[in-house]
Amino acid sequence: MRIFSGDNKVVDSPASNPGLMSPSNFGGDFGSRLKVNVTSKKKLNDSSPTSPMESSPVSPELVPILTLLNAHTHRRYHEGVFLILQDLNNNGTHAARKWKDVYGVLLGTQLALWDAKELAEFTDPSCPVSEKKLKEVASKPTYINLTDATLRTLDNSDNIVMECGKNLTNALVVSTTLKNRYFLQFGNKESFNAWNSAIRLCLYECSSLQEAYTGAFISSRGAKLGDIRILLTNRKYDYKDWVSVRFGAGMPWKRCYAVISQSSSKKKGHFGEINLYENDKKVKKNHAMATIVEAKALYAVYPSSPKLIDSSTIIKVVGSVKFEKKESAQEKDVFIMPEKHQAVPSYDTIIRFLIPAMDTFKLYGRPEKLLSSKNDPHSLLFGLPVLPHIYYLEVEDLLPLTNSVSSLHWSNNEWKEHISDILQRKIAQGYCGCNSTSNITSPLPSPFLGSADLFERADGVLSPKLSYGSKSSSNNSSKNSLPKRERVKLSSSSEQDLNNSDSPSIKRESPPLVISESPHKVHTPTDASFRTRVTEGSPYAKQRHPKAFASSVNDSPSDRAKSRTVPYNNNDRKATTPEKFERGETSCGKNVDESLKKVRNMKLEIPESNFDKFMTDKNLLSVDSKSSNEKKLSVESDLSAIYEKYSNGPFGHTEGLNGSSDETYLRFQRASVHSESNYNSRKSFTPSDFSNGNEEEHAVLQELNSLTQRINELGMESINSNSDSDRINGSYSQVDFDNNNDEDDMNLFDPDFMAQDQLRAEERDYNKDDRTPLAKVPAAFQSTGLGITPDDDIERQYITEHRSRHEVPKRSPEKPSNPLEIGNPYAKPGTRLNTTHTHSKTDRSITPQRGQPVPSGQQISSYVQPANINSPNKMYGANNSAMGSPRNPKTRAPPGPYNQGWNNRPSPSNIYQRPHPSDTQPQAYHLPGNPYSTGNRPNMQAQYHPQQVPMPIPQQPNRPYQPYAMNTHMGSPGGYAGAAPPFQPANVNYNTRPQQPWPTPNSPSAHYRPPPNLNQPQNGSAGYYRPPAPQLQNSQARPQKKDGFSQFMPSATTKNPYAQ
């Protein structure tokens, strides 16, 4: 049966279910009719979950602590009859408020309840249907979850008067999830003390095991964090993250922004606080929704299944909370669930919240160092039982506390402190736990309760048990059957010794059973109907199998837990020490050699376990020798491997890391945080780097390591420089890669690689300092659809920004340059252009002037440029023909080859841009100033219209005009003596800045005028610019010469092409 499910589980018909064991000796007839065959299979409608170890792998460090958690889930603390009244419903409204007599069994933190009247109705053996009805009633218990419950005892000072007029005494007030509240009343003081001790102990063991689980979780998962050493240092900065929080179990979750503030004082009583805000905008303390000002305990909540360990992020904080700044703090259980982040493991998220929270409240040794000692009450691992012991304390160990009058007014935290004091005194005497068990067939049993937990008993003792299903039964059984319970069969000599023990059979009366509606009218059953122990002559006792670890009266855990009066004598109890186990004795003097032999069948493998400290045979358990340390571990813990790693580095900043740093990174190579330097430093893996000893896993990791090394060794040079496609597509000159030498070292597997190259290509297109492609093209070149036609045979070549204009470019003698083919995106691989031009000085020295024919001896290449490719002027240039533009009937020079780059965009230099059709009037010019105000800033756009001619510098009118140095020829003979025309990108939009009017004779700038562009040929070659003399004030403006851009402007003597 599932613990937290609200559905009632119904057993099958009696034909398929031979019988059930009695919950208690609830009458002689009732107990005899609920005999159970322990070897029979019990089938339920609910599927029985298999062992988590068989379904999913669990870290070896967590196996012992999970075993203890499941042992606590199945522990049978106490059972008996009492009255219960539900006061409030889950929504806070009044319930029926009627007393009901129930029979209860406390299993772990689950209180199972049956209606005592219904059970009593089917005790008549003469009724043929009573057995069937009894099984149906017994299979439908009501559960109350006490995991997060709050207990309060009532006494005469509370003055709670019932309807009968009497005070409510011997009662407990239990507040559970949401707003549910129950009143439990017991028949006498002894019953009240027993139940109070059992419930207090189960809550203490639950919280202690959760803290121990947190320590094991941090130990096993925290080592996977690459920055765990930094995380565990004593730091003072605040931690902020989005969380979901709820105040009390069952309350709704609310999303808020948590800020963990560290304490500025090192004093013991000064703590930080956790402020919870509704959003991350207002994070001042006066805007806090709630503030956790103190914490008594803080731990990660075990998710009840090993499969959910790495995905659960729930944290429980037991402390004081303030909802208003001026009000006093309230004791609350706060549940915090940090939000998961993308591509971040859940254990990474929860650990990064746990450590700062422990630091701010100075819990468990933080912020200095996490405590790992079992003897320290402030440690996460305090009092943890040493396997094969599975429990912290017995129920009767708490009877002195419940008998004390002062305990009636203790809070939950005070109860925890007093229980810790008892445990600490016992540990000082060599106490290692209680209730050893040897019939473990699986280290991780099912965490769910079944019929065996509710009804089965062994030897009439209500001792805690663990229902472990064997692997064979769980594999062969169907989904609707529980695992078969296996028992240890002792030899005849051992059985005879146990049966002939001198321990007397004690008969005790149970508390009075209330069978009337009024709680003060009671009926006491007969002596024969209530007995906590059955005599040896009883026929029911002969059917039971004695336990392997039998105990005397003073050593049994729960046979006195039933409501009876037994004086508590702590001197009669002897601590079970490891020395007695080594001699084969328990505290009651029984020889356990036969029992220890049964442990050989246990399928439990725990690295560096210290089972050998408690057993005579050291080979009882298989221990991984690869992960064991050379030094012998002490017996102060059952999680030896965890404690050693938990107490040493990197979990303490005062000690160094165990082993080399490379081994640590190799062992946890799947860490969530790793720097690139640390990743590259991992060269190889060795079998000693892994502690699990799994050869198959080592082989897989070795294969992944070799693959990673091959990927890291793979660079750009294996793709760009030596590929066959490069040899086919053409050779590259040394000049082409002068600025790209660093690209060979790029990592192709970098996710930002393509984005970086695209940005670089964009920068090349608009970079004024980049190289400008110039090409040698034929004069008879046809229109390409770009609005440009060739005019003259002009030789152009690549120009680099880092070279001076007097330096001759170097070319590779092995690979002659063919820039026409390099820039052509449609060139087929393996085909070269039919050109025979050479790079001799005679070919490049002669620059054709305007109207000058091309030398007949010069050979030109037959380059064909594709149409309408990356055309920035496609809108205005699509209708151009070979006859030329309407404004310029002459043919123009074609553009150079496409600029190299990832986007293969044409070079912005020397590309003619056709004016807008509506520009029928002369364009206004800028006021005189520096036309190249952008300087060497390549990404700055031009500050003037593409067709606006910049004005000369007024401060130096006689200085030769020095245009932008980007288009300066590289000093080739016969090249340009001055500089090329200014850079005008083809795809720059029209200037949106307000344009100044034409300068008038009376204006301050009237003595300046635009340059006539007389010495600036249209085809791109220019000499030194000679600024004209300043114009006189009284003289008439000279007519502009019909040269340059002015020849396209309409005037009285020029025919307007758009006027037709």
Curated annotation (Swiss-Prot):
The gene is CAF120. It comes from the Eukaryota. Residues 465-481, 718-731 have a biased composition (Low complexity). Subunit of the 1.0 MDa CCR4-NOT core complex that contains CCR4, CAF1, CAF120, NOT1, NOT2, NOT3, NOT4, NOT5, CAF40 and CAF130. In the complex interacts with NOT1. The core complex probably is part of a less characterized 1.9 MDa CCR4-NOT complex. It comes from Saccharomyces cerevisiae (strain YJM789). The keyword Coiled coil does not apply. Belongs to the CAF120 family. It holds the Pfam family PH. The modification Phosphoserine is found at S491, S510, S518, S538, S556, S871, S885. The lineage of its organism: Eukaryota, Fungi, Dikarya, Ascomycota, Saccharomycotina. Its main location: cytoplasm. One of its GO terms (cellular component) is cellular bud neck. Transmembrane segments: none annotated. Residues 75-204 form the PH domain. Residues 571-588, 801-814 have a biased composition (Basic and acidic residues). Acts as a component of the CCR4-NOT core complex, which in the nucleus seems to be a general transcription factor, and in the cytoplasm the major mRNA deadenylase involved in mRNA turnover. The NOT protein subcomplex negatively regulates the basal and activated transcription of many genes. Preferentially affects TC-type TATA element-dependent transcription. Could directly or indirectly inhibit component(s) of the general transcription machinery. It is found in: Cytoplasm; Nucleus; Bud neck. This is CCR4-NOT transcriptional complex subunit CAF120. Residues 1-29, 465-588, 718-742, 801-1060 are annotated as: Disordered. Residues 490-504, 845-883, 900-923, 931-945, 1048-1060 have a biased composition (Polar residues). InterPro entries: PH-like_dom_sf, PH_domain. Keywords: Activator, Cytoplasm, Nucleus, Phosphoprotein, Repressor, Transcription, Transcription regulation.
